[in-house]
Amino acid sequence: MSSPNPEDVPRRPEPEPSSSNKKKKKRKWLRQEASIQALTRAGHGALQAGQNHEALNNFQRAFLLASKAPQTRDTPVLQACAFNLGAAYVETGDPARGLELLLRAHPEEKAQGRRHGDQCFNVALAYHALGELPQALAWYHRALGHYQPQGDQGEAWAKMGACYQALGQPELAAHCLQEASQAYAQERQLRAAALALGAAAGCMLKSGRHRVGEVVQVLEKSRRLAERSTERRLLGHLYNDLGLGYSQLQLFPLAVEAFLQALPLCWVPGEQATVLRNLGMAHNALGNYQEAREFHQKAADLHGSVGQRWEQGRSFGSLAFALSQLGDHKAARDNYLHALQAARDSGDMKGQWQACEGLGAAAARLGQYDQALKYYKEALAQCQKEPDSVRERLVAKLADTVRTRLAQVGLVQTHTLTSAPGRLQAPGGASQAEGTPAKAGSSTAGVQHRSSSGWEDEEFEEGHQKKKEERSANVPVRAGPGRPELCFLPGTVNHSHHLASSCPTFTKHTPCRGTVLGKASIYSPGPRAHLPFVGPGPPRAEYPSILVPNGPQANRSSRWPRESLSRSRQRRPMESGICTIV
């Protein structure tokens, strides 16, 4: 007898889930939902506390729970978890993985509202961090459209300005930053508005398309906004930045005024040292060498007290220059030696050849021509990567020192001294009387004596001759004499050009950035994420900032490299000087 076909065997209908089972599943889902909410809140709190990796761990667990629960697959809850996790990845330095998750959250073009603006903004941040700036700009534009009705467009404008800066389009960057400032002012975020406007002025300078009056007008507006803010420490940074802007315009009396306003508002020793150094630079430019000496001495002492060897070395160099202008060439030599040692200790190659050039000039002033030759040769050997004008200046000084040395020992009659094959001669073939030191100035015969450093004297001298012309013409931003290098307080981008010769520097401080998931901005409280379970309104964190840096900042917690400022060795990618504060 054949066995019955299993398909022919009647099956009992599967029992429908009992009401008790439904209740169990519902309770289980409610527990999972509560866990997702708790993990999301914990992740958000960790971000606010700067604990990025703990935040990432919480968002990962929330995303896994949402992925496993059948009720949340392909739902807004899962999308929100993907969004938060993606933003956290961007925040912690993994923009590629973050971008994948952010796109999974489906930031729809047709959707409107702040939440969708946040989605677009974080996608833009990821592209920005990956260096895909055109894509980043497109998503910032999209975020801007979502934010406009909500009044949140300031951050999007600010980040667009950063992109345009990185693309080498300072004019567009200036426009975006001015729009950002206006938006922040409308939102009563006076701190962010003032900083954005200060950054816009820097971009205007860099573009070279604006007259001095236009830039000054923007700087003054930034000052007025800052004065309405109650954040006193911010005011210190901003006044320092204003001083930098005035210095770039060669409006040194206004720069001194701004730096003096910054000084009592900067309480951290490193920040105070930065402002003091800037004050010294501005007074050097004005020819107030006694005041400059006092400020540079205080700056060097303060930088040394907090272990800022790089900055201390530059302060010693500026102090030596002021001393040389006061005629104290022995003290100038001693401080150039301090500057040289500090530059060697901190790996500051530019500072080393600058100090050697100053030592050569000081030795020549003291009649120690063998020492002068030694230091000029050392400076020339160390500046091979500098512009041609630097090497040409050193060659001229070296040639003039050789000629002066020969005249001094009586080997050659000064009036018959001429060039010979393989012999260096000062430009123009000028000569000087035996044993007679050359006068400080611009004559070719006295090149090595123009200043004890070979930088500020000739550069500021030529700069002052051009000042009247520059005030009536567009402001050029290019390498050349007459413009001191700027020093920034950490957190700022130096908008000055690279100088052809070795100028001392004004300085800028750079602020540390905190973190909040979602939108990030240079001037604003920073990024925010749409955290679906954290209650109304995304929290923001307040973090001081100065100018827009090159490149993206993934979220508020990402630390930007400190560029071209008065900083310690590890944070010195750009060669610049007037100093910024962090």
From Swiss-Prot:
It comes from the Eukaryota. TPR repeats lie at residues 36-69, 79-112, 117-150, 154-187, 236-271, 273-306, 313-346, 353-386. Residues 441-454 have a biased composition (Polar residues). Disulfide bonds: none annotated. Residues 1-31, 418-481, 548-582 are annotated as: Disordered. SUPFAM superfamilies: TPR-like (SSF48452). Pfam families: TPR_12, TPR_7. Keywords: Repeat, TPR repeat. Residues 462-472 have a biased composition (Basic and acidic residues). This is Tetratricopeptide repeat protein 24. It comes from Homo sapiens (Human). The gene is TTC24.
